[in-house]
Amino acid sequence: MSLEKIINDAWEIKDQISPSSDQKLKDAINQIIADLDSGKVRAAEKVNGQWIAHQHIKKAIMLSFRIYPMENLNGPYSSWYDKAHLLKGKTAGWSKEDHEKAGFRMVPNSPVRKGSFVGKNAVLM
């Protein structure tokens, strides 16, 4: 079954989706988030001068909020309470080399969620 079908089928029963949902669905959602993070896919893109929204990608993002619980996050400047699955992933644990390889700059306390593609030479504030 394709990722798109898994996501579209789950969307039809979105009110029933929870952290205890099927692992196949979680894997599909996580794969789409990883593909967004790497820039492999986009939620929307311009094709022949027209913007095309990929609905199953948007649905996967929304469903991800249903399969993960709220969490408390503590950092050096503040603490947060949110769906941490997307906050902990983009640069958590990165080394200096990882940041240099990614090619973008993040000033302190600038969040970027997992699933957000950040292009080279960007400065996040």
Residue ranges with predicted function:
Residues 1-104:
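Terminal amphipathic alpha-helical/low-complexity segments used for targeting or macromolecular assembly
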